[in-house]
Swiss-Prot record:
Free-text tissue specificity from the UniProt record: Restricted to the thymic stroma.
Name of the featured protein: Parvalbumin, thymic CPV3
Residues reported to bind Ca(2+) 2: D91, D93, D95, K97, E102
Native organism: Gallus gallus (Chicken)
PROSITE patterns the UniProt entry points to: EF_HAND_1, EF_HAND_2
Domain EF-hand stretches: 39-74, 78-109
Entry GO CC: cytoplasm
Length: 109
């Protein structure tokens, strides 16, 4: 399964256009524009599984910086500041990584 099986390609494109400039990425805004915030819990778990590149059950900081590239190969890498802000917003237990439940909570909040 791919992200375009769950999210509309046009919504993904719009979300990526919105954050093309460095330091313009807002996770909440990306989730809204891409349509992620309207998806069911099971769909969000599948999205998380796709984004968890190493299939560790977590999205670590190294994976997070390539977040946009998981949606489109040519997308930019998140800046260090964007990556740290994204991680801090989602990592509720402070373990330095985002679990599936933390991801789902962030998307749906």
């Amino acid at each position: 399964m791919s992200l375009t099986d769950i999210l509309s390609p046009s919504d993904i494109a719009a979300a990526l256009r919105d954050c093309q400039a460095p330091d313009s990425f807002s996770p909440k805004k990306f989730f809204q524009i891409s349509g992620m915030s309207k998806k069911s819990s099971s769909q969000l778990k599948e999205i998380f599984r796709i984004l968890d590149n190493d299939q560790s059950g977590f999205i670590e900081e190294d994976e997070l910086k390539y977040f946009l590239q998981r949606f489109e190969c040519g997308a930019r890498v998140l800046t260090a500041s964007e990556t740290k802000t994204f991680l801090a917003a989602a990592d509720h237990d402070g373990d330095g990584k985002i679990g599936a439940e933390e991801f789902q909570e962030m998307v749906q909040s």
